[in-house]
C-alpha cells in the first residue's frame, strides 16, 4: 500500500510539470492566433502585454485604463443601467445615504445600514460585472461602496451616539455582513504563487483576518499568522532574498527533484524558511500576538477519517509547525510527523488522536465534514477567497475573472469539458469507487458559501522556471505570477471586502478607545487618604494650646 501511495504521489507531482507544458502550449497558441487576428491591437492583445510586462499593480492599473479607453469599453463603466444587478436600488440607496450623512441624520442612517449591510446587496458582487473592463466595474457600484464606508466613519466619530449604541451597531453589523477567509489550497510546484497573492492583498489593504491552508498552502498561511501588521512589509520585502539564501545551501538539483516534486524548487526549501520563523509558537499564541486566525487543514491520514481543521479554537496549544507538517504528510520528509502540544511549563508532548474529539471523524467527506464548512461554522465565514494551485484540479476550474482570448463558443466548450470532468470524478467519489488517497488529487471540496477562485496563468516561457536550477529571479518570478493573478480580482474584492475590513478596524478602534470607569472604592481611597493627611496638617497649624 505504501508503494502504491508513493507511486501516486510521484505521479501527482509530475502532473504539475505535464500540465504546465500543456497549458503553456495552448496559452502560446491562443496568444499567437489572437495577435495575428487582431493585427497587434485591441483588448485581446492588451491582455497578453499586461501579463507580460506589468510588474506592479500601479502599472497594471494604468495599462488597463489605457486598453479600456482604446477598445471603447470605458463608457460602459459610466452607464449605470445593467441587467446584471439592481442598479435602481443601488442608486436610490447611494442617494439616501449621502443625504443622511450631509444632514447628519444619525438614527435614520443607523436603521438604514442595519437593514442593508449585505456583501452582495443588489447583486453588486456578481463576477460578470468585473469582466467587461480590465480597470473596474460600474462607477455607481464603486460610489455606493465608498458612501457606505463614509457613513460608517461618520457613525464612529459622531458624538450623538453613546458608546454602548455604537458597540451594539458595529457588533451586529459585523455578524450580519459576515467574514472572509483566504484559503491557500495545495500547490506542490507552485507554493510561491500563494505568497504573491497574499502580498498583493496586503498592499491593497484587502488581506482578511482569517487565513487557512493545506499542503504547501499551509506553509504560507502559518507564516502570515505570526507577523504583526507593522512587520508584514518587511516580510514581503525580504522573503525572496532570505529564501534564496536557503536555496544556495542546497546542492541537490537533479532531475529526480523534478520527478519527486514537479519543480526544482521543492517544498523543503520553503519549509525550512517557515520553520525558522514559527519556532514553537502555538495557535493561541499566534492569535494573541497578531489577531489573525490561522486554520491548518490536516488530511485524513494524519488524524482521522476526514480532513480536520486545526485553529486556536479546536487546538489552541498545538504547535503550528507540527500542524503544518501534518498537512504536508504527503511529502516524504513529513510522512511520520506527529502533532505536538505545548504544556504549561513550556515543554512539548506528542498529541495522539485520543487527545482530540473530532466532530466528524469517520464520516464520509460530505458538506458538513469538509474544511470549508467547518471554518464557516466556527468563524461566521460567508465568503472565501481561494488561491488554487493544485495542478490536477486546473482542468476542472473556470476562472470567471479571466479575460479570455478565445471566442465565446470555444470558451463554452472548454467550460463544458471542465464541468464534465469534475462531475464524473464526483460521481466516482459518491459511489465509493475513488480511493481516499486519490480523492484529494481529483475532487475538490464543496464550498458552502460565496467564493472567488484565483488560479495562476502560465506562459510558454514558464517551462524553463520549472526545469532549471532556481535562482533569485525565479523565486521573484513565481511570486509575481501570484501577484498578476490577483490584480484582475482587485475591483471585485474591493466591493466584496472593503466594508468588512472597515467594520473590523472601526470595531477594534472602538474597543481600544474604551476607558473603564473607576469604581467608587478606587475614587474614594486616594481622596480619603489625602483628606486625612490635610486634616492632620490643619490641626497641627491651628492647634490651640
Curated annotation (Swiss-Prot):
UniProt keyword annotations, A-Z: Hydrolase, Lipid degradation, Lipid droplet, Lipid metabolism
GO BP of this protein: lipid catabolic process; triglyceride mobilization
Residues annotated as domain PNPLA: 182-358
Name assigned to this protein: Triacylglycerol lipase ptl1
UniProt-listed Pfam families: DUF3336, Patatin
UniProt keyword Hydrolase, yes or no: yes
Assigned EC number: 3.1.1.3
Gene transcribed to yield this protein: ptl1
Main location: other
Signal peptide: none
Motif interval(s): GXSXG: 213-217
Subcellular location per the Swiss-Prot or TrEMBL entry: Lipid droplet
This protein's GO CC annotations: lipid droplet
Amino acid at each position: 500500500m505504501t508503494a502504491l501511495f508513493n507511486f501516486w504521489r510521484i505521479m501527482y507531482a509530475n502532473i504539475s510539470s505535464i500540465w504546465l507544458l500543456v497549458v503553456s502550449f495552448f496559452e502560446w497558441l491562443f496568444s499567437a492566433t489572437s495577435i495575428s487576428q487582431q493585427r497587434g491591437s485591441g483588448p485581446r492583445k492588451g491582455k497578453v502585454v499586461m501579463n507580460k510586462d506589468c510588474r506592479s499593480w500601479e502599472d497594471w492599473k494604468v495599462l488597463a485604463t489605457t486598453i479600456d479607453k482604446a477598445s471603447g469599453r470605458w463608457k460602459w463603466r459610466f452607464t449605470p443601467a445593467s441587467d446584471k444587478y439592481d442598479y435602481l436600488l443601488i442608486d436610490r440607496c447611494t442617494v439616501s445615504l449621502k443625504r443622511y450623512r450631509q444632514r447628519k441624520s444619525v438614527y435614520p442612517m443607523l436603521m438604514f445600514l442595519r437593514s442593508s449591510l449585505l456583501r452582495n446587496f443588489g447583486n453588486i458582487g456578481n463576477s460578470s460585472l468585473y469582466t467587461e473592463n480590465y480597470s473596474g466595474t460600474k462607477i455607481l457600484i464603486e460610489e455606493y461602496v465608498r458612501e457606505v464606508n463614509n457613513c460608517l466613519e461618520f457613525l464612529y466619530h459622531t458624538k450623538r451616539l453613546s458608546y454602548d449604541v455604537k458597540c451594539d451597531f458595529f457588533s451586529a453589523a459585523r455578524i450580519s455582513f459576515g467574514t472572509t477567509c483566504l484559503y491557500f489550497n495545495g500547490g506542490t510546484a507552485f507554493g510561491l504563487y500563494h505568497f504573491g497573492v497574499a502580498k498583493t492583498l496586503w498592499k491593497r489593504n484587502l488581506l482578511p483576518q482569517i487565513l487557512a491552508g493545506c499542503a504547501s498552502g499551509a506553509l504560507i498561511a502559518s507564516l502570515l499568522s505570526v507577523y504583526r501588521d507593522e512587520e508584514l512589509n518587511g516580510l514581503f520585502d525580504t522573503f525572496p532574498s532570505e529564501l534564496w539564501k536557503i536555496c544556495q545551501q542546497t546542492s541537490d538539483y537533479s532531475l529526480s527533484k523534478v520527478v519527486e516534486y514537479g519543480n526544482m524548487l521543492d517544498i523543503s526549501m520553503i519549509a525550512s524558511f517557515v520553520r525558522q520563523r514559527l519556532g514553537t509558537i502555538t495557535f493561541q499564541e499566534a492569535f494573541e500576538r497578531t489577531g489573525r486566525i490561522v486554520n491548518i487543514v490536516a488530511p485524513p491520514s494524519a488524524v482521522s477519517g476526514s480532513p480536520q481543521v486545526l485553529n486556536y479554537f479546536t487546538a489552541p496549544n498545538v504547535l503550528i509547525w507540527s500542524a503544518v507538517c501534518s498537512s504536508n504528510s504527503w511529502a516524504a520528509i513529513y510522512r511520520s510527523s506527529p502533532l505536538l502540544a505545548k504544556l504549561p511549563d513550556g515543554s512539548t508532548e506528542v498529541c495522539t488522536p485520543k487527545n482530540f474529539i473530532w466532530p466528524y471523524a469517520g464520516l464520509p467527506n460530505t458538506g458538513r465534514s469538509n474544511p470549508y464548512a467547518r471554518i464557516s461554522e466556527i468563524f461566521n465565514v460567508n465568503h472565501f477567497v481561494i488561491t488554487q494551485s493544485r495542478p490536477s484540479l486546473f482542468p476542472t476550474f473556470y476562472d470567471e475573472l479571466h479575460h479570455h482570448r478565445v471566442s465565446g463558443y470555444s470558451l463554452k466548450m472548454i467550460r463544458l469539458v471542465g464541468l464534465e470532468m469534475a462531475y464524473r470524478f464526483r460521481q466516482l467519489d459518491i459511489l465509493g469507487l475513488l480511493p481516499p488517497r486519490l480523492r484529494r488529487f481529483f475532487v475538490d471540496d464543496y464550498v458552502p458559501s460565496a467564493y472567488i477562485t484565483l488560479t495562476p496563468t502560465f506562459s510558454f516561457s514558464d517551462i524553463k522556471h520549472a526545469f532549471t536550477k532556481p535562482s533569485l529571479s525565479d523565486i521573484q518570478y513565481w511570486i509575481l505570477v501570484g501577484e498578476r493573478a490577483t490584480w484582475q480580482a482587485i475591483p471585485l474584492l474591493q466591493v466584496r471586502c472593503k466594508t468588512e475590513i472597515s467594520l473590523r478596524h472601526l470595531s477594534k478602534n472602538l474597543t481600544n478607545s474604551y476607558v473603564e470607569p473607576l469604581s467608587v472604592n478606587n475614587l474614594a481611597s486616594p481622596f480619603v487618604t489625602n483628606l486625612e493627611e490635610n486634616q492632620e496638617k490643619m490641626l497641627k497649624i491651628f492647634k490651640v494650646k
